[in-house]
Amino acid sequence: MNKVVVKNVTFGEGAPKICVPMVGKTVAALKEEAEMLQTIDLDVVEWRVDFFEDVKDLAKVEAALDEIRTILPETPILFTFRSAKEGGELAVSDEFYFELNETLARTGKVDLVDVELFNEEADVLRLIETAHKNNVKVVMSNHDFDKTPAKEEIVSRLIRMEALGADLPKIAVMPKSAGDVLTLLDATNTVSEKANQPIITMSMAGTGVISRLAGEVFGSAMTFGAAKKASAPGQIDVNELRHVLDLLHKQF
């Protein structure tokens, strides 16, 4: 499997890397969050820009990013606009979604960009090309807040993401039962054994918490923890998350 190196973080080896979302609505709130995150043992910060009140003003988005980057100069930043259809805060046009992501990828100030799989393929490929030209890695994602698809469908989506050029394919699903969590873990194990790229998977809500902890066993390279406000159901406090990941890593 290829390793994916972003600043001082290597995905695809050792314990899953911890990503903590920033969800501030204003520049002041984002600066406060970034200063708090300086004190926390994390690997990646995800800026959930769909929470930002001025997201439709690209100059203000870049200015906010500058403020975050000043406070967190060495921390890998994942730039994510989560669309409303995949559980995000704001519905925007496809045109704006791609303009926002391409513009920010070109700045060279983010390290990774989230690209949702279920968009026009030509647009997805263009954004991946723009990101890679600017040395930005691509997390390609899909989120199902209603259900857990069949194992074959989860595997198929992750393999498709890799085929399109994702550096880190990602899928998050909602379990209705413990069996659904096993389906996600089984799919993760299957893909991680044959994929070229590290993958990121999770089963959400309380039932799925085990999937956020057991990535090193089943093959998920990153997990999401909450420092202030969870951006998805089931996220664990980042300090507790690190403790459990370290415990499992020592035994593995």
From Swiss-Prot:
Q: Kindly list the biological process annotations in GO that this record carries.
A: 3,4-dihydroxybenzoate biosynthetic process; amino acid biosynthetic process; aromatic amino acid family biosynthetic process; chorismate biosynthetic process
Keywords carried by this UniProt record: Amino-acid biosynthesis, Aromatic amino acid biosynthesis, Lyase, Schiff base
The pathway where this protein functions is: Metabolic intermediate biosynthesis; chorismate biosynthesis; chorismate from D-erythrose 4-phosphate and phosphoenolpyruvate: step 3/7
Question: What family is reported?
Answer: Belongs to the type-I 3-dehydroquinase family.
Fetch the PANTHER family from UniProt: 3-DEHYDROQUINATE DEHYDRATASE
**Role, per record:** Involved in the third step of the chorismate pathway, which leads to the biosynthesis of aromatic amino acids. Catalyzes the cis-dehydration of 3-dehydroquinate (DHQ) and introduces the first double bond of the aromatic ring to yield 3-dehydroshikimate.
Assembly, in brief, is:
Homodimer.
What is this protein's record name? Answer: 3-dehydroquinate dehydratase
- What is the native source organism of this protein? Listeria monocytogenes serotype 4a (strain HCC23)
Gene (name only): aroD
